């Protein structure tokens, strides 16, 4: 598994350098982040990990082109957040994750799921956000989804 990740990272770093555009992985587990960070230390590339919010456990890795510093990088251009409100119930993390995976969305396309009273924030890749916005039920609870700012 780690070998596949590092091979993919090498491809993304090379594409970033060749095209001078930001490239990124899907969301990574903490172990994958550790392996990738160690790999990047021995390469001539700028790697930034971001999960969409402060303190996120699952984060995507972004390879930055020569003209972009980590301080200038805006992850909001490459990640999305969807807010779910559940006024008549309080679904848990497992309920949200089950509903999302039930849509056919792979786990690595979704970052952290921050459950709050009567709602949750879900960080995801931009390609997944439209499907999440269509979600109307989590567990046995009706929900309303909206793009978070």
Stretches with model-predicted labels:
Residues 1-149:
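Non-catalytic terminal extensions of ATP-dependent helicases
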